[in-house]
Amino acid sequence: MDAQDIRRAFLDLLAADGHAIVARAPIVLRDDPTTLFTGSGMQPLLPYLLGADHPDGARLADVQPCLRAQDMDEVGDNRHTTFFEMLGNWSLGDYEKAEQIPRLFRFLVDTVGLDPNRIYVSCFIGDPEHGIPRDEESAAIWERLFTERGVSADRIDLDTEEYGNEHGSQGARIAFYGHKNWWSRFGGPDEMPAGDPGGPDSEVFYYFPQVEHDPAFGRYPHQNSDGGQYLEIGNSVFMTYRKTEDGGFAELPRHNVDFGGGLERIAAASIDSPDVYRISLVWPIVQALEEVSGKSYDDYTESMRVVADHVRGAAFLAADGVKPGNSKQGYVMRRLVRRALRFGLDLELTAGVAADLVPVVGRLYADVYPEVAAQEAAIVAVLQKEEKQFARTLRKGLSLLRRLNRQGETVTGAHLFELHDTFGMPLELSLEEAARKEYPLAEDWRESFDTLMQAQQTRSRAAV
């Protein structure tokens, strides 16, 4: 199945199971001061998960476009994107694990066509200190589902990611973790404030035997390792508990279920590819890059991933009315466009890529998110303006870094400030470039940079 078919099939399945298909939220949350973007499917539904009644009932589903700016520096590997779509379904006090887990398993195996022998899961190991039991119910349901398909369902207790890195999952189908399988808005049970809800979760992973485990992420692979063999494709949260004033936990009167599954990752699993950039919603953008650059994805993998992802994300932000700027959503958009331009230079695309790629993005999403295609000319104009403003100064800034390296100089805070102040290069981009090219940084670069920045701000205030 391609990604478009998976999106449609998910909503059809949930609707047939009595879920109301709710309208998606915008990516840009203008009335939420706590966050810049919608970063998960549950985010717009949080008031209802915390107890409010939803006007459409207790069984809900949607597909939510999301943007996570915090993943920007991770883009370039085979699994991270800033923009993605989240398949979501929720029960507000209606059903629990006994309905959620089997339906998810059937969707992945019978609808999407994933091999059950390559599906692995995780469950909550329990927290005796807080009186929270081990999630045997979820594990037992998973064990039954696997056994019915003739798949082994061994268990292993790993508790922490660090322990898993040292010992591996040893082929066990069901791995028990601690904080990795606990959901709350604030982290583990210790970090939660009194009155806040939380609960165990059960993650689903797809195993790629053709990928060699990266030992940089531990000696042995396991479900929650970033070593490359296991790709998380979904997570069911069972919001069951409320933290009490005395630091303990009590059961909520209404148990909720919150499922989120990454469309791009499920689609990658469906074509047996550990690379999410090869799915039907992203690969045409890569192909357009290959055509305009005359270079191949296999030779310029990281650069093409960054450009494809960042232009896609920037196009959706522009469709939501964001323009590049120096604060909040505008700053994130500026970073996306400028990073795309920087990595585009690796492909010898010196004039930017917006005009070539935005129409492709618009066509890919025209059936479900028509606003990109409808505003194509305006979006291209917004992105091209930023590209043109930054292209010349970017080349000069990169030239300065190369010259310093040729002369054997260490990159200092003063150099980084010059790149920021004179050439308009964001500090993050300069640091990233130095790391990519292994240019040495002065030990006191941060202190020096901050001193110069504060002095500039003082001069600016005095001039007003």
Q: What are the functions of these language-model segments?
A:
Residues 285-288, 310, 357-360, 364, ...:
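Short acidic/histidine-centered micro-motifs embedded in hydrophobic/aromatic stretches
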Residues 250-253, 297-302, 320-321, 384, ...:
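Active-site-adjacent structural elements in folded domains
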Residues 344-351, 387-464:
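Extended, domain-scale alpha-helical bundle/helix-rich regions
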Residues 340:
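Aromatic/basic-lined ligand-recognition segments
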